């Protein structure tokens, strides 16, 4: 079937944002008087749990005690606000080849969508900071983790994106950086282009249709359907 749309993950795929998430979590913990601190290795392990609130709940479970679910929800709101502030300051740019691929896709008539575990607020902040445009001006459909029943590796967010596009999986390609994202996209019936991120290098991505180092033109030449 002819390729009609590209569906992108966000964190680690469009930009190397996971380290900003970790920074925002740690700053929020300190500001709220919570004696939690996530090192890079801590966070690498915690990323196996998708979703910020879920990640904090997992850390609480690992420790055997911690904030209530209501407090975790409050912490997550504060963390999101801090993340948006950091992103808006312009500290994070797009990963190699992302802007160029999106430009080529638009010029060739391909439709664009997002399927992410993160919140819509985080998506909007990143796209505004990196493209200087509202996210909706670039991506026709944005399916965010706070809009579905189950987050990745469940297929819900990709199914929502496909529904919004009105396209079958065979007409789309998904772009991911993690095992949870890969499993989510595959469960939705999509073919997957995998670009490992800082936190996922070394993981087993043998289930991906293509694994390339980044989305630069030189790398994406390995995928004949891409413009």
Curated annotation (Swiss-Prot):
Stored InterPro entries: CbbY-like, HAD-like_sf, HAD-SF_hydro_IA, HAD_sf, PGP-like_dom2
Biological source species: Rhodobacter capsulatus
The family this protein is said to belong to: Belongs to the HAD-like hydrolase superfamily. CbbY/CbbZ/Gph/YieH family.
UniProt xrefs under Gene3D superfamilies: HAD superfamily/HAD-like (3.40.50.1000), Putative phosphatase, domain 2 (1.10.150.240)
NCBIfam families from the UniProt entry: HAD-SF-IA-v3
Pfam families referenced in this protein's UniProt entry, alphabetically: Hydrolase
A GO molecular-function descriptor: hydrolase activity
Protein name listed in UniProt: Protein CbbY
PANTHER family: CBBY-LIKE PROTEIN (PTHR42896:SF2), XYLULOSE-1,5-BISPHOSPHATE (XUBP) PHOSPHATASE (PTHR42896)
